[in-house]
Amino acid sequence: MDRNNLMQALYAMDWERIKTELNAGADVNAPYNKHGWTPFMWVCREFYEPEAIKAFLKACGDINSRNQYEEIPFLIAAKHRSSPQTLAVLLKAGADINAQDKFGNTAFVYIVKHPQAMMRLRVLDFMIDNGADPNIKNKHGKTVWNYAAEQDGLTDYLCVRLLEEKSDE
C-alpha cells in the first residue's frame, strides 16, 4: 500500500478515493512529512465533518499520536476551525481535552487566541462543558485567561460561562 495514494486523495479532497484507500488498508498513522504529520492529523485539520474523523478512527487512527510540535489530533482539530461535533467524536475516542503541545498550549488556548474567537462561542462552550481547564499555563506562563483578556468581551463571556458551569456542579 502506497501511503502517497492516500495523501494524494486527501489533497484532492476526493472522498471516494479516500474511502477506497482506507478500505484497502492505508496506514492512517504513517508520517508523511518531516514534521511527523500523519494522514489522520491532516484529516483533523482539513475535514470538518464528524463522519470523516470517524472513518479514520475506524481505520485505527491513533488518537494520541503526536507530531514534532507535540500536537495530538484533538488539538489540531481545535486549532483549525473544527465544530463541536467533530471535537466530540475525538473526545469520545479518548482524546485528552487538556493535552499540551511543545509550547505548553492546550486546544482551549488556541481557540481563545483565534482572531475570531467571539465567532467561535459554540466551540468555547463545548470546551467548557467538557472540562477544559482554563488555568493551565503554557511555557510563557500564560493561561486561557491571559489570552481572553486580549479579545474584546471574551473574558466576560468566559467568566459567566465558567461560573454557570461551576454552579451546576
Where are the regions that the model predicts?
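Intrinsically disordered, low-complexity regulatory segments in ankyrin-centric signaling systems
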Residues: 1-24, 29, 33-37, 44-45, ...
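Ankyrin-repeat boundary/"N-cap" motif
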Residues: 1-8, 31-41, 66-74, 100-112, ...
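Ankyrin repeat A-helix N-terminal signature
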Residues: 8-13, 42-49, 76-83, 110-119, ...
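Conserved ankyrin/ankyrin-like repeat signature
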Residues: 17, 51-52, 85-86, 119, ...
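Ankyrin repeat domain, specifically the short helix-to-loop turn at the C-terminus of the second helix
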Residues: 20-27, 54-62, 88-96, 125-133, ...
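Eukaryotic tandem repeat interaction scaffolds
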Residues: 66-90
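A structural signal for the main folded, soluble domain(s) of proteins
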Residues: 113, 123-126
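Leucine-rich solenoid repeat scaffolds
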Residues: 133-168
